[in-house]
Each structure stands twice: as structure tokens, then as C-alpha cells.
Amino acid sequence: MTTFEEFESPSTSFNFQTFDRYQPDFKMIDYSHQQATHEYHLPDQEVFQNQNEFSASPPDISSPFADEKIYKSLPRNKCPSKCLVCRNPAIGYHYDVPSCNGCKTFFRRTIITGRKFTCAKQKKCMDGTEPVDMSKRLCRACRFAKCVEVGMNPMAIQAEVKTDEGKVLRSEVLNQRESLGVVSSLIVTEEDLLSRMIEKLTFVESKVEPLHRSGMPPGYRDIRKLEEILDSKPVLVVTDIPNLKFCPSPCANEKRPRRHFTNYVHTSYLASLESSKMFEFSSQLDLESRILLMKHATLICSNMMNAFFSINEMKSDILRHPDGSMSGHMRKFDRENDVMTDHVKLIQKTLITFLNHKVDKIEYLLFKAIMLCNPAVPGLDSWNQEIIEKERNQYVKALLNYCLLQHGKLQGPTRFATILAMAPIIENQSKNQKDFHVYIKAKHFQKHKKMGTTFRKCISCMFDQIMET
């Protein structure tokens, strides 16, 4: 068993008291202007208007479980939650807008007939946030005005407008749409915002996954410290890591050269660190706060990534490295050590939890973002805690909405609670792995002290900084 190869910190705090509505300007850092050789641009809301930036097909959100429902990334592939006109449950997209059957029919009939209505009150009959009482007679003037305001497109009506009044009204609506700047594709619903957040997280994951897969070349070591990694621009390819050091020399008292293996532990940690730098909130934190946060979150995110990769990519029910080798494989004499045996079982906990609850990729991405943004890490000041908590609340709200869309209003909250209940298991695994690291470090030091040297092999400086907190 490789002594430092498999290796978790303060308790996780969730704030469910208030959830602000999604921020339309939610975005992640664009590093494309800093590094010309790689594209790191993460699309914000404006970029989504450009169909050339992203194809119409949703990102890969496959899961190893064939019987689950998959939420399509594109909003039009999922029935919207409410009508934008009357705020009652919608039945689909009609004339480019999420709407109910009543409002759809009313808009079509009004355009075809060309009828015009007058409000007897103050033209505020459709104002408010609560669903309109459909059992009462609605103000037709305000209802039609609301249809136009939210972006219903008269040109999408298939029935022919034969009357002169209808043609005049259609022309007026089109002119009004232009003056209001109404663009139907920009109407933002909660489903649209969730889809955009999912696509952004999927994009980040796709950028760091090659780094996670590659592993450090045998014999090479990344000599950078944690603060150097966090304070530099993203490095998503192993060959771009600055100051790679080749360490071929074995211990002085060994009779034969030490066999070198691909170091997947370091690149797994590195993938978690590099992905964190792509979130906009990271740039709002000072370097000291980022170091504190990532000393806590790196191992957690790495464990989650390793577990989901083993399930989804390797189709395995045990933890495996990207080359297919078993993670935590013990040598013959290690099997007689209860501490080693318990550790091998320990590192499987996150994977077993994901398997038991059939976590799909979107749940994994959102949950990992929640675990990354932990304002309860000791040492953070109130200003930085507020930034992190605000970011976390967005992901918590997104996960809740996703669970409601996938499992309905009855089972959705239960599924949401089930996913969040995995947090203590993952946190405890991280803490126990760090305790094991201290045990191995002391044992290794004692061994080499008896040999007359304090030489100690380590995976990397960054690894030691994270594991020794």
C-alpha cells in the first residue's frame, strides 16, 4: 500500500432561513485573456444568446443508473412551472412563452378577431406575484397587455388572421414588442436559470476532468505550495505545471531502486483547486481566506470527484484510479494491520453513499458546489463568510428546484433532504483521512529515525499542507 496515497474538518453549516432569488448576473471567472493557449471562458447570461458559443444539445448529464429521470439542460425540454401571464400552473410553451391553456387561447383569439378592450380600473388588474383567481372574471384589457408584456409572439399563431382588425392589432403588437425590447428567448424562468447554472458547472467539470484523469508522471513532483497554486492562473494540463521536479533517487538504505507510480492523488487535489478558481466568488476572497477554505474543501471535493468518476466512468462499485487500478490496494503485510484495513474501508464511504442513493451527475455537481462553499470554516472573517454563504445559497436553491422538477412536489423535498444528509458522512471521511495521514507520518518518521535518517517521502508540498490542517 502506498503510504500517503489515499487520504478529510469543521462541521458543515447550512443556512435555510432565507434564499434570495437567483442572480441573473451569476457568472464565473473568464481566464481566457490571461492564457492564450487554453479557452477557459465560462458563459454568463449574455453569452447564452449566442447560439454559436454552445450547441443546442444539452451537456452530458448521464448517470450509471438507467431507470432514473434526466432533467434536460435546455429549458424547452421540460414543462415550465407557471404561466408568465396569470402565474397559474403552465402546460407548456405557447407563442414563445410559458403559459397555461387559458392565456394561450385568449391571446390567439384576441389576435385573430382583432378585438380591443378597455380597463375600467387603473390598468393594474394583473399586477402582483400570487396566481390570479381564474374563477373570477378577468380584465381582458390587462390580460392582453400582460400577454404582450411577457413576450407572446403573434407571428407564432398558426391560424390565419383574416380580418382587417386582426391584422392591425398584430402589427401594433409587433411594434410594441420592438419598442419594449421584448425578446422571447431572454425571458428568464427558474428552469432557465437552473439550466444555465447546470451548464456552467458542467463546463467547469469538463475543464478539470482531463487533469484529474492524467495523474502526475512517474518520478515527477509538483513542488509548488498551496498558496502559489491558488494565487496563479489555472493550469489544466500536467505539462503546463511550472517547476515540475524529477525525483528518481531512492532512500539511501534501500538495496534496489524504488518503483515509481503515476501519482493520481496530487492531480485529483489539483483538479479541485483549479476548479475552485473558476468560480467568481473566489476572486472576491483574499488569498488568506481562499487558503483556509481550500484546506478544508479540497479533500472533500476530491473524494466526491473520485467517487463519482469511479461510478460513472469506471462503472465500478469500488474506488478506482483513472487507469483502472484499485484505490487503497494493500500489500500482503498491510492486511495484518487493522489500522490499514479500516482505512481502506474508510475511503470507500463517499462512493458507497453515492451508490446507495443513486446520485446523478447534476445532483453531484450541485452538491459538490455546496460542499465547496462552506462559510463555517474556522478563521474566516464575517465579510468573507457572507460572500461564501451567498454563493452557497444559490446552489442550495438550485438543488431544491432540481429535486422538485425531478421527483415532484411530494418526493422532491425528501430527495433534497436525503442529498444534504450525505454531508456529515463526507465531512467525517475527510477528517478521518487527515487523522490517518498524521498516523502514517509519525510511523514513517519513526522508521527512518531508526535507520539513521529523517528522510520522508511525500506526495507534494500542497498535499501535506492540506492533510496537516
Swiss-Prot record:
Membrane-crossing segments per the record: none
Record key words, sorted: DNA-binding, Metal-binding, Nucleus, Receptor, Transcription, Transcription regulation, Zinc, Zinc-finger
SS bonds (residue pairs): none
One of the Pfam families matching this protein, by short name: Hormone_recep
DNA-binding region: 80-159
Cellular component GO terms, alphabetical: nucleus
Molecular function in Gene Ontology: nuclear receptor activity; RNA polymerase II cis-regulatory region sequence-specific DNA binding; zinc ion binding
UniProt zinc finger (NR C4-type) residues: 83-103, 119-142
Domain NR LBD intervals: 230-459
BP terms from Gene Ontology: cell differentiation; regulation of transcription by RNA polymerase II; response to starvation
CDD domains per the UniProt record, alphabetical: NR_DBD_HNF4A
Family: Belongs to the nuclear hormone receptor family.
Chain's role: Orphan nuclear receptor.
Protein name listed in UniProt: Nuclear hormone receptor family member nhr-154
Species, as recorded: Caenorhabditis elegans
